[in-house]
Every structure is written in C-alpha cells, then in structure tokens.
C-alpha cells in the first residue's frame, strides 16, 4: 500500500510540475505576443508619424521666397465657378479635415474663397488632393494663405525680364536660379489664367542695380530646365504687368477692406502721349533687318513668339526695317520685350514702339498663320501650307476678334473703345476682400 501510495503521489507531483511548465510557457508566449504587437504598433505609429511629417504639397503658385508653411492652416481657393456655394465648398474641403471657417467672394466669371482648418495637416492635404479638382466643370486652384508681411515690397527694386522659360519652371525654380545674387528679392513666372500654363517668361527683382545688370550678362544663355533663358531689363510696360499680376493674384485684407496701391500707381503714372502709355499704340517697329528678310519671314518670327493676334506686317526691305501691328497694346508691349535682340539672318533686330497710334475703327482681323519656311509635298485633298493646329488657332483668333469687334461696337464713343482696349489688354481690374475674423493681421492670398 505504501508503495502504491508513493507512486500515486509522484505521479501527481509530475502532473503538477507539467501543468506549471505549460502555464509558464503559455505565459511566456503571451508576453512575447504582447511585445510583438506593441513593437508592430509602435513601428506603424512611427511610420505614420513620419509619413505625416514628410507630407508636403508642391507649391503651385506665387509664394514668397523662403515662405515657411509649417504653422499655416489656411488655404486660398481660386477659379471657383460662380454656381458654387459656400456649403458646397465646405463639403468638398471637409474631405481633407475638419473645416473651421469658409468664406466665398463671388465674381461674375470666377469666384474665389478661403478655407481655414483646425490643423495644418488638413490644409496640406487639401492642397495635395484638391488642387486642380473640377467643381461644376471648372478646375479650382488651391494654395497656402500667408501674411502679406512675408513678401518683400519690390516696387522700388530693379526688375529684369527672363524669357524662353520651359513649361516646368515655376516661381521657386526661377528664384533658386537667381538666388546666387545676394540682392535677389523676388521671382515671378507669368501664367495664363485660362489654360493654367506658363507663358514662357517671368521677372526677377533685385535690390542692387549692379547685381541686376550682372545677372543679365551672366545668366543669358544659361540652361534652366530644358531651355536656354534670355535676360534683359524689364521695360516699363512689363514692370507694370508684373505689378498688375501681383495685384491680380493677391488680395490684401486690411480691416475688412481690400487695398490695391499698385493699381492706383499704375493708373496715375505717366502720360498717354507716350506710346508705352497709350492704349491705341499697337504697332511694333522692327529695325536692323537684313535686306533679304521679307514680309512672310518677319511674320513667321513674330507669329512664333505666340504673344497675340497679328493683324498687319509691313517690311521696307531696301531700308532694313518693318512694322508688326497687334490686336491690342498689351500684346505689342510683350512682343517688343521678347523680340528685341532676337537674331534674324545673323543680325539682332531692334524693336520699339511705332510712332503712330492705331486709328480708332481700324479693321481688327488677325492674319492667317504664316507659311512654314519649307514647303511640304502636295497631297490631294489636304490643305497645303498650314497644320491643323494652325488652322484651328486662326479660326479661334478670328472668332475672338469678331466677338471683340461686336463688343466695341456696342460702346459709345472713343472712351468706350479705349476702355474695351484696356480690358482686352488685361490692364485694369477690381478686387475685393473680406474681413478676417480670427486676426487683425493683414493676409495675402495668392493663386
């Protein structure tokens, strides 16, 4: 009995030790599983935090050099369809985060607005995901909002024109290219508001005149992106165009009212007796032409600039000069800036304003696209000399000119014609603001 009892007791002890070992193993496995889960959750959290930290939208508009959006939680919304309401705008932008405030400023053709988020990440996500989104068939523009004091006033600086910019060059790229000059204060690429594409030129501002002159000499012919750039002093018209673009892209809010000092300055400066200030002057004088340059060749060179509709081209081959008339003053001013110094047949041409303004009532009809310098092999049933793109462009220009002519005819007197010309050149505009309820600080919002 004693032997049997001892064996039974030993078996119980062994079973107890086995259960303890199993419990210890289960406990160790549970602890290991918990540690693994904690590690994985920590890694995921760290990865998520890193991803959110690295999330940064690409700048798509006129932000000031060195702008730091690290504390910004407000975005500007441009090119908003007139049918869009504030409630619809809030609904769209809440896809990126909780919206604190939304304000929509209505315009006849396209409105604009402002969206304030409770945190910066939501604002950054809105710029990344909503810029270019179509609402009511119209692509909106979304960018950071920032204090006006962050952009330096360059009205008294020295401005240079930079042409032949490739399509991928934006403000930040242009500024970085010229930032090697210590007095470089600003850089702007001019954009077409209808197409959203670069116009192929821009302006760079300098505090020091000597550095601006050095930049013109040293940077001309340098590669920026995929093209070699051309630099020159900005003419008065181009400087005003830059100021006008600043005014168009910016709304300065001061105690609930918009201020636009640059607009007033451009209206009051200068006399209309000078060609550069006379909206009726639309003709470009072209000098230093080789005697072999004829009307078609001159037309082709200015047509390739792509600055506007050409209505007349005249050449005095024996005297080495000619004239190119555009549909409006702004197009002619841009052509002077872009074509001056252009090498034609081995000679740099000289461009300036024609002496005589275009008489009121002059027929406004764009010339057909010029023939190419080579002649394609004739094919039956195919129009010769022009590409399909040329024909479409010509038809579009012709339609726009006819519409513009009808609008001008509806005006009364010369004042109406001048006003229509100014509007066609895009040199006048009115802008409104809205009161910033959260801060008395001036705010500036850029496209």
UniProtKB/Swiss-Prot annotation:
Alphabetically ordered keywords of this record: Repeat, RNA-binding
Biased composition (Polar residues): 254-269
Gene3D superfamilies, per database record: 3.30.70.330
Sample GO molecular function, one term: mRNA binding
Pfam families in alphabetical order: RRM_1 (PF00076)
SUPFAM superfamilies: RNA-binding domain, RBD (SSF54928)
Start and end residues of each stretch annotated as Disordered: 254-279, 353-372
Matching InterPro entries: Nucleotide-bd_a/b_plait_sf, RBD_domain_sf, RBM42_RBP45_47-like, RRM_dom
Domain RRM: 73-147, 158-236, 282-356
Domain of life assignment: Eukaryota
Subunit structure: Interacts with RBP-P.
PANTHER family per record: POLYADENYLATE-BINDING PROTEIN RBP47B, TRNA SELENOCYSTEINE 1-ASSOCIATED PROTEIN 1-RELATED-RELATED
Biological function: RNA-binding protein.
UniProt-recorded name of the protein: RNA-binding protein 208
Organism: Oryza sativa subsp. japonica (Rice)
Lineage of the organism: Eukaryota, Viridiplantae, Streptophyta, Embryophyta, Tracheophyta
């Amino acid at each position: 009995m004693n032997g049997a009892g001892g064996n039974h007791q030993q078996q119980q002890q062994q079973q107890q030790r086995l259960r303890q070992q199993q419990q210890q193993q289960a406990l160790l496995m549970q602890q290991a599983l918990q540690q693994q889960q904690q590690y994985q959750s920590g890694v995921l959290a760290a990865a998520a935090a890193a991803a959110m930290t690295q999330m940064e939208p690409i700048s798509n508009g006129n932000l000031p050099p060195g702008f730091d959006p690290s504390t910004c939680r407000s975005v500007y919304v441009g090119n908003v369809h007139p049918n869009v309401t504030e409630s619809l705008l809030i609904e769209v932008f809440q896809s990126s985060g909780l919206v604190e405030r939304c304000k929509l400023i209505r315009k006849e053709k396209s409105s604009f607005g402002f969206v304030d988020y409770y945190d910066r990440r939501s604002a950054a996500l809105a710029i990344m995901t909503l810029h270019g989104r179509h609402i009511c068939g119209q692509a909106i523009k979304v960018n950071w909002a920032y204090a006006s004091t962050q952009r330096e006033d360059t009205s008294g600086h020295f401005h240079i024109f930079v042409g032949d910019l490739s399509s991928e060059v934006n403000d930040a790229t242009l500024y970085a290219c010229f930032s090697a000059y210590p007095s470089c204060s600003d850089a702007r690429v001019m954009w077409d508001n209808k197409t959203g594409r670069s116009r192929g030129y821009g302006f760079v501002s300098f505090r020091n005149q000597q550095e601006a002159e050095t930049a013109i000499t040293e940077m001309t012919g340098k590669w920026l992106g995929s093209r070699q750039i051309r630099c020159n002093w900005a003419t008065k018209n181009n400087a005003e165009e830059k100021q006008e673009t600043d005014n168009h892209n910016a709304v300065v809010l001061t105690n609930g009212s918009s201020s636009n000092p640059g607009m007033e300055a451009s209206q009051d400066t200068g006399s209309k007796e000078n060609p550069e200030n006379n909206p009726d002057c639309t003709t470009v004088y072209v000098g230093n032409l080789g005697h072999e340059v004829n009307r078609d060749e001159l037309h082709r060179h200015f047509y390739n600039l792509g600055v506007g509709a050409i209505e007349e081209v005249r050449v005095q081959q024996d005297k080495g000069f000619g004239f190119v008339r555009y549909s409006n003053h702004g197009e002619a001013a841009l052509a002077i800036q872009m074509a001056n110094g252009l090498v034609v047949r081995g000679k740099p041409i000289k461009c300036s304003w024609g002496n005589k303004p275009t008489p009121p009532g002059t027929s406004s009809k764009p010339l057909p696209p010029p023939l190419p310098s080579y002649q394609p092999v004739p094919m039956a049933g195919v129009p010769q000399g022009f590409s399909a793109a040329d024909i479409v462009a010509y038809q579009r220009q012709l339609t726009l000119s006819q519409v513009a002519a009808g609008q001008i005819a509806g005006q009364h007197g010369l004042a109406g014609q001048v006003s229509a010309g100014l509007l066609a050149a895009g040199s006048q505009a009115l802008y409104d603001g809205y009161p910033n309820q959260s801060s008395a600080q001036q705010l500036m919002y850029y496209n």
